[in-house]
Amino acid sequence: MTNGTPGVPGGEPPHPSAEMLASATKGFDYLFANDIVGSREHFNSKDDPFHLMGAGVIAFLEAALGMETNQVTEASRCLALSETGTRKQMKAPKAKTHSRFPAGLEWDIINADAVVLLGLTHALSETYMGYLQCMYSLNNAHSKFTKLYKTVFPAGIDAEEKPPAPAEVAPSSSSTLQVPNGLQHKSSFSSLSSVSSTGSNATLPPAPPSPTQPAVTKSFFSRWLGSSAAAAASEPTLPLHHHQHHHIPDGPVEELIVSGTAFGYGLFNLVFSLLPKKVQSLVGFLGFQHDRKLALKALALSASKKDVHGVFAGLVLMTYHGVVLLLSGWQADEARIINQYKGIIDNVEERYPEGALWILNRAKILRMSCDAEGAIRVLQNGLKPERPHSFAQADMMLLFELAWTLLGQRRYQESADSFMKITELNTWSHATYYFLSAGCHFALGNLEKTQELLDAIPGLIHNKKVGGKDLPTEVFIKKKLAFYKEKQKRRCGDEAKFAEAIRINPAEELGIFWNTHARVSKEICKSHVADVLHLTPALTITSPTITALSSNSNSNPTLPTPASATAAMSSLSLSSKSSTASKTSPPSLSKSKSPLDLDTPDELAVRSLLLGICHRTLEEFDAARKFLLDAHGYQGQVKVNTWVGGVAMFELAVLELKEVEFLEKGGGKVDWMKAMKVADERLDVALSLSPNSVDLSSRLDSRISMLRDEMGIKREMLGGKA
């Protein structure tokens, strides 16, 4: 859906769908500028499939971003009407058009969009029937986008000639959105996944001309139902349409067709490629294939267009780059990712400077570039009450990012307030936000508030389940609360005040899953080390940072007391033994009759894991390796924190790569292939330690997949075998 007049450049009569498309585009302009009220009013003013789709998108975003169940019904209603309307248009007689594409192809695009969103809306119901309907819809849409891809890009995406820009639309100034060269389309969708995800150029021949539609890979549903899908079976077959030497400049409808096809096809490939391996095996059985490199090319092509699909493609790419930068742990070419990320944002933000989603991603770039304070300023400005328009669900995402960034900066009071404010904006897992806020108050030494928040959590945990299971973070939280209570009981304390038994900040512990400690300053990392340095039993691993912190503590007894020591409520002495302690044995606490702070393997494992991550950020790699190996060493002894072993091995894999990168920057001789071999072995162990029974195992599974992809890119850069 493209900005501009509906007519076709060059004096040709307007496309039959151009007027509806131009009007619907205006509604999306309101949405992207945060004016959700104006957008809804505009879409509700007409009942054609384009406008019904727009109304459905608004309701879907409200339902998905805010987990607002009352919007699910409205989204389903609008999207179902749009799907029905486009299906009628697909079967209706087609007027003659001056276009390089078959007449009416735009309706196939909108129909496929409606089917995808309708399927995802079914999934929001969190019922077994909803999930079944979702899989059915996705299978249907998968077939549709496969056919569209073959029609719109018969020789592959790279063979798509960049058409002359319509007179009313200026070409994109972002060079980062140009589609790379080198990939040729193969003759079937199933073969696309065999294109090397690491090779820079494929030499496969283009698909030969054919008067009929090539066979689509049979899926589980097609075998089960006897056709690819009931709805798809009633569609007219899309012919292969060769248009390699078109001379008619593209108008808005042509941009919709190109951008929409590339977006839908790329989105499917990318989403399936990011699923945990265990889930990929299931969707592979269902017939879904994926090729991440092709997905990114398709999305980049879509994002380079001015059509509405291009904006959504840009948003998908921003989200992908943000996730890789945050969770993969290491990137083969971080500067390239950040530059591409910036280019996409610049392209969209120029058109919609007030849009919350672009503000969010601008802040993420700053955070990933280690400018957390800059990110905080951007987010706070984006949340100012004097803004002309606001989109509550998008604001929630800004607030979520702000809360995590403040937590990473140890601005605990502001972070606690932000997490609690999120509970006013959406209904998703208030227990998680209370737990994080409680951790912030623990860090501030406010045990009374910590206890108050933790006491409220059992009443907040939803009975509603996802896929028949509790929310992963809530499973984690329930285990932690039981652990704290058991520890307090074991120590003969008042069980109603179990917060007294906490020694390691709950928010920082949960933050390990969000990789909070990887992109913070060295000073902040030193503060994290100081928080757990004096906990008993004494550390048996030392480092330059530990030695320096211990020495400072001895020479300056007026230093602030760590929150963990405040929580101890005991007569522990924070003064260390003589500063002449051995380099291989860090200074320890004075002997005391008080119970140990950390009296279980679970706590000792988490302390070592946190120290390992922080020392890696401090570039003290030897100590980091020792701490991470120590954390993994408790694997057979932990009872609650069974996730630590797998995460520790993942962090060790990241360490192997970061250490070589650090040495290379310093001019040292390095062996990347050896380092990646060791990292691969670490990841194998990590994967073996994260079965479904382990907390947040799917998150670790996805992180492992992303890191391996980055290693594949590095091998390509080195000219080695993937």
From Swiss-Prot:
Residues 187-204, 576-595 have a biased composition (Low complexity). Pfam families: Iml2-TPR_39. InterPro entries: Iml2/TPR_39, TPR-like_helical_dom_sf. Keywords: Cytoplasm, Nucleus, Phosphoprotein. The keyword Nucleus applies. Transmembrane segments: none annotated. It is found in: Cytoplasm; Nucleus. GO terms for cellular component: cytosol; mitochondrial outer membrane; nucleus. Signal peptide: none annotated. The keyword Acetylation does not apply. Residues 186-215, 576-597 are annotated as: Disordered. Belongs to the IML2 family. Interacts with lipid droplet proteins. Inclusion body (IB) resident protein that interacts strongly with lipid droplet (LD) proteins. Involved in LD-mediated IB clearing after protein folding stress, probably by enabling access to the IBs of an LD-stored soluble sterol derivative that acts as a chaperone in inclusion clearing. This is Inclusion body clearance protein IML2.
